[in-house]
Curated annotation (Swiss-Prot):
It comes from Dictyoglomus turgidum (strain DSM 6724 / Z-1310). This is UDP-N-acetylmuramate--L-alanine ligase. Coiled coil: none annotated. HAMAP family: MurC. Pfam families: Mur_ligase (PF01225), Mur_ligase_C (PF02875), Mur_ligase_M (PF08245). It is found in: Cytoplasm. The lineage of its organism: Bacteria, Pseudomonadati, Dictyoglomota, Dictyoglomia, Dictyoglomales. The gene is murC.
Length: 464
Protein backbone atom coordinates (compact mmCIF):
# COMPACT_ATOMS: atom_id res chain seq x y z
CA UNK A 1 0.00 0.00 0.00
CA UNK A 2 2.69 2.50 1.03
CA UNK A 3 6.45 2.63 0.60
CA UNK A 4 6.99 3.46 4.25
CA UNK A 5 7.55 1.66 7.53
CA UNK A 6 6.86 4.39 10.09
CA UNK A 7 3.74 6.54 9.62
CA UNK A 8 2.77 9.55 11.76
CA UNK A 9 -0.78 10.97 11.83
CA UNK A 10 -1.18 14.64 12.78
CA UNK A 11 -4.63 14.93 14.39
CA UNK A 12 -4.96 11.21 15.01
CA UNK A 13 -8.02 11.56 17.28
CA UNK A 14 -10.25 12.54 14.36
CA UNK A 15 -12.70 9.88 13.25
CA UNK A 16 -11.32 9.52 9.74
CA UNK A 17 -7.69 9.70 10.82
CA UNK A 18 -8.03 7.18 13.66
CA UNK A 19 -9.77 4.70 11.35
CA UNK A 20 -6.96 4.94 8.79
CA UNK A 21 -4.35 4.65 11.53
CA UNK A 22 -6.02 1.46 12.76
CA UNK A 23 -5.95 -0.08 9.26
CA UNK A 24 -2.26 0.81 8.93
CA UNK A 25 -1.47 -0.86 12.26
CA UNK A 26 -3.37 -3.98 11.22
CA UNK A 27 -1.36 -4.08 8.00
CA UNK A 28 1.91 -4.08 9.90
CA UNK A 29 3.05 -0.46 9.77
CA UNK A 30 4.66 1.24 12.76
CA UNK A 31 2.19 4.02 13.59
CA UNK A 32 2.36 7.11 15.78
CA UNK A 33 0.12 10.13 16.08
CA UNK A 34 -0.48 13.41 17.85
CA UNK A 35 -3.52 15.40 18.89
CA UNK A 36 -4.55 18.01 21.41
CA UNK A 37 -7.14 15.63 22.81
CA UNK A 38 -7.54 11.96 23.58
CA UNK A 39 -10.69 9.93 23.04
CA UNK A 40 -11.91 6.36 22.79
CA UNK A 41 -10.22 5.99 19.39
CA UNK A 42 -6.78 6.98 20.66
CA UNK A 43 -7.20 4.70 23.67
CA UNK A 44 -7.95 1.81 21.31
CA UNK A 45 -4.95 2.69 19.15
CA UNK A 46 -2.71 2.77 22.22
CA UNK A 47 -3.83 -0.76 23.04
CA UNK A 48 -2.60 -1.76 19.56
CA UNK A 49 0.85 -0.34 20.27
CA UNK A 50 0.45 3.08 18.68
CA UNK A 51 2.49 5.86 20.26
CA UNK A 52 0.10 8.77 20.95
CA UNK A 53 1.54 12.22 21.70
CA UNK A 54 -0.56 14.77 23.59
CA UNK A 55 -0.14 18.04 21.72
CA UNK A 56 1.96 18.88 18.69
CA UNK A 57 5.76 19.04 18.75
CA UNK A 58 8.32 18.79 15.92
CA UNK A 59 10.09 16.05 17.87
CA UNK A 60 7.04 13.85 17.33
CA UNK A 61 7.87 13.46 13.64
CA UNK A 62 11.52 12.57 14.05
CA UNK A 63 12.43 9.24 12.46
CA UNK A 64 9.20 8.78 10.49
CA UNK A 65 8.92 7.90 6.80
CA UNK A 66 5.53 9.45 6.11
CA UNK A 67 3.23 12.07 7.66
CA UNK A 68 -0.54 11.92 7.16
CA UNK A 69 -2.67 15.06 7.56
CA UNK A 70 -6.31 16.05 7.13
CA UNK A 71 -7.89 19.30 5.96
CA UNK A 72 -8.27 20.27 9.62
CA UNK A 73 -4.49 20.67 10.00
CA UNK A 74 -3.46 24.30 9.34
CA UNK A 75 -0.34 25.01 7.26
CA UNK A 76 1.40 26.54 10.27
CA UNK A 77 1.08 23.40 12.41
CA UNK A 78 4.58 22.92 13.81
CA UNK A 79 4.75 19.21 12.98
CA UNK A 80 3.55 19.87 9.45
CA UNK A 81 6.09 22.69 8.99
CA UNK A 82 8.90 20.49 10.37
CA UNK A 83 8.02 17.65 7.98
CA UNK A 84 7.95 20.00 4.97
CA UNK A 85 11.29 21.58 5.86
CA UNK A 86 12.93 18.16 6.08
CA UNK A 87 11.25 16.80 2.95
CA UNK A 88 9.43 14.07 4.83
CA UNK A 89 6.67 12.83 2.50
CA UNK A 90 3.26 14.22 3.45
CA UNK A 91 0.01 12.55 2.42
CA UNK A 92 -3.54 13.84 2.82
CA UNK A 93 -5.82 11.31 4.48
CA UNK A 94 -8.06 11.30 1.40
CA UNK A 95 -5.10 10.10 -0.69
CA UNK A 96 -4.45 7.30 1.77
CA UNK A 97 -8.11 6.27 1.63
CA UNK A 98 -7.98 6.51 -2.16
CA UNK A 99 -5.10 4.02 -2.19
CA UNK A 100 -7.22 1.62 -0.16
CA UNK A 101 -10.23 1.99 -2.46
CA UNK A 102 -8.08 0.98 -5.43
CA UNK A 103 -7.14 -2.32 -3.81
CA UNK A 104 -10.67 -3.67 -3.29
CA UNK A 105 -14.18 -3.38 -4.65
CA UNK A 106 -15.07 -0.27 -2.70
CA UNK A 107 -18.53 0.68 -1.48
CA UNK A 108 -18.39 4.44 -0.92
CA UNK A 109 -21.17 6.30 0.88
CA UNK A 110 -21.45 10.00 0.06
CA UNK A 111 -23.98 12.69 0.84
CA UNK A 112 -24.65 15.62 3.11
CA UNK A 113 -26.38 13.63 5.85
CA UNK A 114 -26.62 10.05 7.04
CA UNK A 115 -23.22 8.87 5.80
CA UNK A 116 -22.04 7.33 9.05
CA UNK A 117 -25.28 5.50 9.81
CA UNK A 118 -25.64 4.26 6.23
CA UNK A 119 -22.00 3.12 6.07
CA UNK A 120 -22.48 1.30 9.37
CA UNK A 121 -25.63 -0.43 8.16
CA UNK A 122 -23.99 -1.59 4.93
CA UNK A 123 -20.92 -2.78 6.85
CA UNK A 124 -23.06 -4.74 9.29
CA UNK A 125 -25.06 -6.32 6.46
CA UNK A 126 -21.88 -7.46 4.72
CA UNK A 127 -20.41 -8.72 7.99
CA UNK A 128 -23.49 -10.80 8.73
CA UNK A 129 -23.48 -12.21 5.21
CA UNK A 130 -19.90 -13.46 5.85
CA UNK A 131 -18.38 -11.12 3.25
CA UNK A 132 -15.64 -10.02 5.73
CA UNK A 133 -15.23 -6.46 4.39
CA UNK A 134 -12.67 -3.87 5.34
CA UNK A 135 -14.56 -1.11 7.16
CA UNK A 136 -13.84 2.56 7.84
CA UNK A 137 -16.71 4.46 9.44
CA UNK A 138 -17.08 7.91 10.97
CA UNK A 139 -18.40 6.69 14.31
CA UNK A 140 -18.20 3.92 16.85
CA UNK A 141 -19.79 0.70 15.54
CA UNK A 142 -20.29 -1.75 18.39
CA UNK A 143 -20.22 -4.86 16.19
CA UNK A 144 -16.63 -4.24 15.11
CA UNK A 145 -15.53 -2.71 18.41
CA UNK A 146 -14.63 0.68 16.97
CA UNK A 147 -14.54 2.68 13.75
CA UNK A 148 -12.39 0.43 11.58
CA UNK A 149 -11.76 -3.20 10.72
CA UNK A 150 -9.34 -4.87 8.31
CA UNK A 151 -11.15 -7.66 6.49
CA UNK A 152 -9.95 -10.41 4.19
CA UNK A 153 -12.88 -10.12 1.77
CA UNK A 154 -12.95 -8.38 -1.60
CA UNK A 155 -15.06 -5.40 -0.46
CA UNK A 156 -14.23 -2.19 1.39
CA UNK A 157 -16.93 0.01 2.96
CA UNK A 158 -16.13 3.65 3.73
CA UNK A 159 -17.50 7.18 3.82
CA UNK A 160 -16.59 9.65 1.12
CA UNK A 161 -15.90 13.21 2.24
CA UNK A 162 -17.48 15.77 -0.06
CA UNK A 163 -16.72 18.74 2.22
CA UNK A 164 -13.49 19.58 0.40
CA UNK A 165 -14.08 17.70 -2.85
CA UNK A 166 -11.77 14.86 -1.84
CA UNK A 167 -14.48 12.28 -2.56
CA UNK A 168 -13.40 12.72 -6.20
CA UNK A 169 -10.11 10.99 -5.38
CA UNK A 170 -11.89 7.74 -4.49
CA UNK A 171 -12.63 4.86 -6.84
CA UNK A 172 -16.06 3.49 -5.94
CA UNK A 173 -17.20 0.15 -7.31
CA UNK A 174 -20.53 0.82 -5.62
CA UNK A 175 -21.54 4.40 -4.83
CA UNK A 176 -24.35 5.32 -2.42
CA UNK A 177 -25.58 8.93 -2.36
CA UNK A 178 -27.83 9.55 0.64
CA UNK A 179 -28.74 13.14 -0.27
CA UNK A 180 -27.31 16.42 -1.54
CA UNK A 181 -27.74 19.65 0.41
CA UNK A 182 -26.47 23.23 0.54
CA UNK A 183 -23.60 22.56 2.93
CA UNK A 184 -19.89 23.40 2.68
CA UNK A 185 -20.69 26.53 0.69
CA UNK A 186 -17.42 28.06 1.88
CA UNK A 187 -15.72 25.56 -0.43
CA UNK A 188 -18.25 25.08 -3.24
CA UNK A 189 -19.81 28.58 -3.36
CA UNK A 190 -23.01 27.17 -4.91
CA UNK A 191 -25.34 24.17 -4.72
CA UNK A 192 -24.83 23.53 -8.44
CA UNK A 193 -21.12 22.91 -7.90
CA UNK A 194 -21.95 20.40 -5.15
CA UNK A 195 -24.27 18.54 -7.52
CA UNK A 196 -21.61 18.60 -10.23
CA UNK A 197 -19.15 16.97 -7.82
CA UNK A 198 -21.49 14.08 -7.08
CA UNK A 199 -22.22 13.61 -10.77
CA UNK A 200 -18.48 13.35 -11.41
CA UNK A 201 -18.20 10.68 -8.70
CA UNK A 202 -21.01 8.69 -10.35
CA UNK A 203 -19.08 8.89 -13.61
CA UNK A 204 -16.16 7.11 -11.89
CA UNK A 205 -18.23 3.98 -11.19
CA UNK A 206 -16.81 1.26 -13.47
CA UNK A 207 -18.61 -1.25 -15.65
CA UNK A 208 -19.97 -3.97 -13.38
CA UNK A 209 -20.39 -1.51 -10.53
CA UNK A 210 -23.46 0.58 -9.78
CA UNK A 211 -24.82 3.58 -7.88
CA UNK A 212 -27.60 3.60 -5.27
CA UNK A 213 -29.40 6.95 -5.13
CA UNK A 214 -32.01 8.53 -2.84
CA UNK A 215 -34.93 9.40 -5.13
CA UNK A 216 -36.69 11.37 -2.38
CA UNK A 217 -33.99 14.06 -2.50
CA UNK A 218 -34.74 16.73 -5.11
CA UNK A 219 -31.07 17.52 -5.65
CA UNK A 220 -30.30 13.85 -6.27
CA UNK A 221 -33.14 13.70 -8.78
CA UNK A 222 -31.54 16.63 -10.58
CA UNK A 223 -28.32 14.71 -11.19
CA UNK A 224 -30.11 11.45 -12.05
CA UNK A 225 -31.41 13.20 -15.17
CA UNK A 226 -27.80 13.75 -16.27
CA UNK A 227 -26.45 10.22 -15.72
CA UNK A 228 -25.23 8.55 -18.88
CA UNK A 229 -24.26 4.90 -19.40
CA UNK A 230 -24.05 4.02 -15.70
CA UNK A 231 -26.03 1.36 -13.86
CA UNK A 232 -27.96 2.80 -10.93
CA UNK A 233 -30.83 1.97 -8.58
CA UNK A 234 -33.03 4.33 -6.60
CA UNK A 235 -34.60 4.08 -3.15
CA UNK A 236 -37.23 6.07 -1.29
CA UNK A 237 -40.85 6.30 -0.21
CA UNK A 238 -42.32 6.98 -3.66
CA UNK A 239 -41.68 5.48 -7.09
CA UNK A 240 -38.18 4.21 -6.40
CA UNK A 241 -36.69 0.83 -7.34
CA UNK A 242 -36.44 0.03 -3.62
CA UNK A 243 -39.47 1.37 -1.79
CA UNK A 244 -40.66 1.37 1.84
CA UNK A 245 -44.41 1.11 2.43
CA UNK A 246 -46.88 0.33 5.23
CA UNK A 247 -44.63 2.19 7.65
CA UNK A 248 -45.10 2.10 11.43
CA UNK A 249 -42.99 4.54 13.46
CA UNK A 250 -42.49 4.17 17.20
CA UNK A 251 -40.12 5.32 19.92
CA UNK A 252 -37.82 2.34 19.58
CA UNK A 253 -37.63 2.25 15.79
CA UNK A 254 -39.88 1.36 12.89
CA UNK A 255 -41.41 -1.40 10.79
CA UNK A 256 -42.07 -1.35 7.07
CA UNK A 257 -42.52 -3.48 3.98
CA UNK A 258 -39.80 -3.22 1.37
CA UNK A 259 -40.45 -3.63 -2.34
CA UNK A 260 -38.07 -4.02 -5.26
CA UNK A 261 -39.75 -2.81 -8.44
CA UNK A 262 -43.20 -3.66 -7.03
CA UNK A 263 -42.12 -7.12 -5.81
CA UNK A 264 -42.47 -7.42 -2.04
CA UNK A 265 -39.21 -8.63 -0.51
CA UNK A 266 -40.47 -8.77 3.07
CA UNK A 267 -41.04 -6.83 6.27
CA UNK A 268 -38.20 -5.02 8.00
CA UNK A 269 -37.83 -3.96 11.63
CA UNK A 270 -35.38 -1.30 12.79
CA UNK A 271 -34.21 -0.44 16.30
CA UNK A 272 -33.17 3.08 15.33
CA UNK A 273 -35.96 5.69 15.17
CA UNK A 274 -36.95 8.13 12.44
CA UNK A 275 -38.00 8.06 8.79
CA UNK A 276 -34.49 9.12 7.80
CA UNK A 277 -33.19 5.82 9.16
CA UNK A 278 -35.70 3.93 7.01
CA UNK A 279 -34.12 5.63 4.00
CA UNK A 280 -30.64 4.76 5.27
CA UNK A 281 -31.64 1.11 5.64
CA UNK A 282 -33.17 1.01 2.16
CA UNK A 283 -29.80 1.85 0.65
CA UNK A 284 -28.21 -1.03 2.58
CA UNK A 285 -30.98 -3.37 1.40
CA UNK A 286 -30.41 -2.20 -2.17
CA UNK A 287 -26.68 -2.92 -2.02
CA UNK A 288 -27.37 -6.33 -0.49
CA UNK A 289 -30.01 -7.26 -3.07
CA UNK A 290 -27.97 -6.22 -6.10
CA UNK A 291 -24.96 -8.15 -4.76
CA UNK A 292 -27.15 -11.23 -4.42
CA UNK A 293 -26.94 -11.51 -0.63
CA UNK A 294 -29.54 -13.29 1.48
CA UNK A 295 -32.49 -11.02 2.31
CA UNK A 296 -33.31 -12.64 5.65
CA UNK A 297 -29.70 -12.40 6.82
CA UNK A 298 -29.67 -8.76 5.72
CA UNK A 299 -32.86 -7.83 7.58
CA UNK A 300 -31.69 -9.62 10.74
CA UNK A 301 -28.50 -7.56 10.63
CA UNK A 302 -30.49 -4.34 10.26
CA UNK A 303 -32.80 -5.33 13.11
CA UNK A 304 -29.77 -5.82 15.37
CA UNK A 305 -28.30 -2.44 14.48
CA UNK A 306 -28.64 -0.02 17.40
CA UNK A 307 -27.04 3.01 15.84
CA UNK A 308 -23.69 4.70 16.21
CA UNK A 309 -22.54 7.08 18.90
CA UNK A 310 -23.89 10.63 18.78
CA UNK A 311 -26.79 9.82 16.43
CA UNK A 312 -30.02 10.31 18.45
CA UNK A 313 -28.19 8.54 21.26
CA UNK A 314 -29.99 8.08 24.59
CA UNK A 315 -27.24 8.80 27.11
CA UNK A 316 -29.31 8.17 30.23
CA UNK A 317 -32.03 9.33 32.60
CA UNK A 318 -31.55 11.77 35.47
CA UNK A 319 -33.82 12.58 38.38
CA UNK A 320 -37.42 13.60 37.75
CA UNK A 321 -37.56 11.23 34.76
CA UNK A 322 -35.57 13.58 32.50
CA UNK A 323 -34.24 11.85 29.38
CA UNK A 324 -30.82 12.95 28.12
CA UNK A 325 -30.12 12.53 24.40
CA UNK A 326 -27.14 13.56 22.29
CA UNK A 327 -26.88 14.03 18.54
CA UNK A 328 -24.17 15.13 16.13
CA UNK A 329 -26.55 17.07 13.87
CA UNK A 330 -25.44 20.58 12.94
CA UNK A 331 -26.96 21.24 9.50
CA UNK A 332 -30.61 22.40 9.33
CA UNK A 333 -31.73 19.19 7.59
CA UNK A 334 -30.12 17.07 10.31
CA UNK A 335 -31.51 19.25 13.09
CA UNK A 336 -35.03 18.98 11.69
CA UNK A 337 -34.84 15.19 11.30
CA UNK A 338 -33.57 14.76 14.86
CA UNK A 339 -36.17 17.03 16.46
CA UNK A 340 -39.02 15.49 14.45
CA UNK A 341 -37.95 12.06 15.67
CA UNK A 342 -37.67 13.09 19.32
CA UNK A 343 -41.10 14.73 19.10
CA UNK A 344 -42.48 11.16 19.22
CA UNK A 345 -41.73 11.16 22.96
CA UNK A 346 -44.38 13.85 23.60
CA UNK A 347 -42.17 15.57 26.16
CA UNK A 348 -41.05 19.16 26.52
CA UNK A 349 -37.99 19.33 24.29
CA UNK A 350 -35.07 21.34 25.73
CA UNK A 351 -32.31 21.72 23.13
CA UNK A 352 -28.75 22.85 23.85
CA UNK A 353 -27.38 23.70 20.41
CA UNK A 354 -23.77 24.51 19.60
CA UNK A 355 -23.37 25.90 16.05
CA UNK A 356 -20.56 24.30 14.05
CA UNK A 357 -18.22 26.55 12.06
CA UNK A 358 -18.49 30.28 11.39
CA UNK A 359 -19.03 29.73 7.67
CA UNK A 360 -22.01 27.42 8.19
CA UNK A 361 -23.54 29.91 10.64
CA UNK A 362 -22.97 32.72 8.13
CA UNK A 363 -24.68 30.89 5.27
CA UNK A 364 -27.44 29.04 7.15
CA UNK A 365 -28.47 30.98 10.28
CA UNK A 366 -32.06 31.45 9.02
CA UNK A 367 -32.44 27.77 8.15
CA UNK A 368 -30.92 26.71 11.48
CA UNK A 369 -33.36 28.94 13.36
CA UNK A 370 -36.28 27.44 11.44
CA UNK A 371 -35.15 23.88 12.23
CA UNK A 372 -34.64 24.70 15.92
CA UNK A 373 -38.20 26.07 16.11
CA UNK A 374 -39.33 22.45 16.45
CA UNK A 375 -37.99 22.54 20.01
CA UNK A 376 -39.73 24.01 23.05
CA UNK A 377 -36.71 25.60 24.75
CA UNK A 378 -33.48 26.47 22.95
CA UNK A 379 -30.14 27.21 24.62
CA UNK A 380 -27.56 28.55 22.16
CA UNK A 381 -23.91 28.37 23.10
CA UNK A 382 -20.80 29.69 21.36
CA UNK A 383 -19.82 28.55 17.87
CA UNK A 384 -17.54 25.54 17.72
CA UNK A 385 -14.99 26.80 15.22
CA UNK A 386 -13.53 23.44 14.09
CA UNK A 387 -10.33 25.32 13.34
CA UNK A 388 -11.94 28.14 11.35
CA UNK A 389 -11.00 31.75 11.94
CA UNK A 390 -13.83 33.99 13.23
CA UNK A 391 -15.84 35.96 10.69
CA UNK A 392 -16.65 39.54 11.77
CA UNK A 393 -20.32 39.89 12.66
CA UNK A 394 -20.93 36.12 12.77
CA UNK A 395 -21.79 34.49 16.08
CA UNK A 396 -24.53 32.45 17.72
CA UNK A 397 -26.39 35.73 18.14
CA UNK A 398 -27.24 35.59 14.42
CA UNK A 399 -29.33 32.49 15.10
CA UNK A 400 -30.67 33.94 18.36
CA UNK A 401 -31.88 37.09 16.61
CA UNK A 402 -33.55 35.02 13.86
CA UNK A 403 -35.44 33.00 16.45
CA UNK A 404 -36.51 36.08 18.41
CA UNK A 405 -37.78 37.76 15.24
CA UNK A 406 -39.44 34.82 13.45
CA UNK A 407 -40.52 32.69 16.44
CA UNK A 408 -41.26 35.16 19.26
CA UNK A 409 -43.14 32.55 21.32
CA UNK A 410 -40.18 30.18 21.40
CA UNK A 411 -38.21 30.24 24.66
CA UNK A 412 -34.59 30.87 23.70
CA UNK A 413 -31.42 31.68 25.66
CA UNK A 414 -27.98 32.80 24.51
CA UNK A 415 -24.97 31.83 26.64
CA UNK A 416 -21.25 32.35 26.22
CA UNK A 417 -19.85 28.86 26.71
CA UNK A 418 -20.48 25.22 27.54
CA UNK A 419 -20.34 25.73 31.30
CA UNK A 420 -23.02 28.44 31.13
CA UNK A 421 -25.10 26.21 28.85
CA UNK A 422 -24.99 23.39 31.39
CA UNK A 423 -25.87 25.77 34.21
CA UNK A 424 -28.83 27.17 32.27
CA UNK A 425 -30.07 23.69 31.38
CA UNK A 426 -29.80 22.63 35.00
CA UNK A 427 -31.90 25.59 36.12
CA UNK A 428 -34.77 25.23 33.62
CA UNK A 429 -35.27 21.46 33.33
CA UNK A 430 -38.55 20.16 34.72
CA UNK A 431 -39.95 16.74 35.54
CA UNK A 432 -40.50 14.64 32.42
CA UNK A 433 -38.44 16.86 30.07
CA UNK A 434 -36.25 15.60 27.26
CA UNK A 435 -32.83 17.27 27.08
CA UNK A 436 -31.02 17.13 23.75
CA UNK A 437 -27.42 18.24 23.30
CA UNK A 438 -26.98 18.98 19.61
CA UNK A 439 -23.93 19.78 17.51
CA UNK A 440 -20.68 18.40 16.11
CA UNK A 441 -18.44 20.00 18.74
CA UNK A 442 -18.15 19.39 22.49
CA UNK A 443 -21.74 20.21 23.47
CA UNK A 444 -22.17 16.59 24.59
CA UNK A 445 -20.31 17.59 27.77
CA UNK A 446 -23.48 19.31 29.02
CA UNK A 447 -25.35 16.02 29.16
CA UNK A 448 -22.34 14.19 30.58
CA UNK A 449 -22.07 16.66 33.47
CA UNK A 450 -25.74 16.30 34.37
CA UNK A 451 -25.66 12.52 34.09
CA UNK A 452 -22.49 12.20 36.14
CA UNK A 453 -23.74 13.99 39.22
CA UNK A 454 -27.45 14.59 38.83
CA UNK A 455 -29.24 17.73 37.81
CA UNK A 456 -29.37 19.43 41.19
CA UNK A 457 -25.79 18.97 42.32
CA UNK A 458 -23.91 18.82 39.02
CA UNK A 459 -20.35 20.06 39.27
CA UNK A 460 -19.93 21.95 36.02
CA UNK A 461 -16.30 22.91 36.50
CA UNK A 462 -14.95 20.60 33.80
CA UNK A 463 -12.59 21.66 31.06
CA UNK A 464 -13.99 22.80 27.76
Amino acid sequence: MLNAKRIHFIGIAGTGMSALAYICVERGYEVSGSDIQENISTIRLKSKGVKIYKGHNPENVNNVDLVVISSAIPPDNEEYVYAKERNIPILHRSDLLADLTKEKKSIIVGGAHGKTTTTSMIALVLENNKIDPTILVGGELEDIGGNAKLGNGEYLVAEGDESDGSILKLDPYILVITNIDNDHLDYYKSLEKIKDTFLKVIEKVPKGGFAVLNLDCENVRDIIRKIKNKEYYTYGFSNADFKADNIVLNLSGSEFDVYFRNEKLGRVKLRVPGKHNILNSLSAIAVSKILGLDFETTTKALERFQGVQRRIQLKGIIEDDILVFDDYGHHPTEIKATLETLRLYNRRLVVVFQPHRYTRTYFLSKEIAEALSLGDVIILTEIYSAGEKPIPGVSSKNIYDEIREKYPNLEVYLVDNIIEAASKAKSILKKGDLLLTLGAGNVWKVGEALLARGRKDANLEYSQ
